[in-house]
Amino acid sequence: MAVAAAVLVASVSEPSGGPPAPPVLGVSADKLLHGAAYATLAAAVALGLATPRGDGTPAGPVPPSGPTRRRVVGLAIGVAAVYGVVMEGLQGPLPYRTFDLLDAVANAVGAAIGAGAWTVGATLRDRVS
């Protein structure tokens, strides 16, 4: 929830108005920031889905492969990507923000990267324990 709240605040707040940051490896810093935010969101969603107990302790490792882990990854990507589209939609009517389809794409790509990173981390954790 905290990550989603931070993304919401960042999405609807008025930008600082400073000059845009220079591109990194040909990718605009804005798109990289979108990707990083939604990678974090998707990883948090995946972790939340794989940790069903209310006290935050895992109920048990999610199988390293199979439908359960794929379902967690798919849901994490879907939830984060849809949240990104909703955030872009909220920006449309704001006078200091705009709806940008490429931002939504960057959000979805970041979500896939974040869910993938969670998968790698969960797999490594399962192998170590």
PLM region descriptions:
Residues 104:
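Conserved post-beta-strand hinge residue in the HATPase_c
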Residues 1-101, 112-129:
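Bulky hydrophobic segments
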